Regions:
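Glycine-rich SAM-binding Motif I of class I
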Residues: 42
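Residues at secondary-structure transition points
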Residues: 3, 7-14, 18, 39, ...
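Conserved phosphate- and dinucleotide-binding cores of soluble alpha/beta proteins
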Residues: 61-184
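HTH-adjacent hinge/linker in prokaryotic transcriptional regulators
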Residues: 1-37, 45, 49-54, 66-71
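Serine/threonine-rich low-complexity intrinsically disordered regions
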Residues: 12, 28, 58, 167-170
Length: 184
């Protein structure tokens, strides 16, 4: 079973922080941004300062963080996944279909050359896939431990996303797509 959010936040915290800080800086005025539920994307919300963008998220915590900053934020509908606080399911996907995102920021449980970007939950995969399809650019926030890992359900191919990571030790990924390595 998937680790709960408290457990995930403590895993590779420094790396996630670097990735989140970099990702937040890519948000520009007039962007329409989807922020996925998850630990690294939630950290990203803490670093976002752009007032002139519109934010949509399926994560309760990210929505609260953004709203407290006075930013324009929409929370999708959907079923609440207790372990992660993510909103999923048909209602969430229907909300996403109404938006034309300039940027989507997604978390992942695994990245593999053959299987692409994966997650253990089919409903979350559907949400991620829809957000990616509705976005001009899709960023996947992914620390080094997620590479060469495959979870049950694929939501995107590597070539269709930009990966932001703390460290890339397998050069095959850089041949498949844009990979931004961030460090201190």
């Amino acid at each position: 079973s998937e680790a709960g959010i408290e457990e995930k936040i403590s895993l590779n915290s420094e790396e996630k922080d670097l990735i989140a800080r970099y990702a937040a800086l890519t948000v520009n005025k007039n962007d329409t941004v989807f922020i996925d539920a998850g630990t690294t994307t939630e950290k990203m919300a803490e670093y976002i300062t752009e007032q002139g963008a519109l934010y949509v998220t399926n994560g309760f915590d990210a929505a609260q963080i953004l709203a407290k900053k006075g930013l324009r934020v929409y929370l999708t509908g959907g079923r609440v996944k207790a372990s992660t606080g993510a909103l999923t399911g048909a209602a969430c996907v229907e909300t996403l279909k109404n938006f034309n995102f300039t940027k989507a920021f997604l978390g992942t449980n695994g990245v593999s050359v053959n299987d692409g970007l994966t997650t253990p939950d089919a409903e979350e995969a559907y949400v991620k896939r829809t957000a990616a399809e509705k976005s001009y650019i899709t960023y996947v926030l992914c620390d080094h431990t997620k590479f060469n890992v495959t979870a049950a359900v694929t939501f995107a191919e590597c070539r269709n996303v930009c990966i932001i990571t703390d460290r890339l030790s397998d050069s095959r990924y850089a041949k498949l797509t844009v990979v931004k390595e961030v460090s201190q």
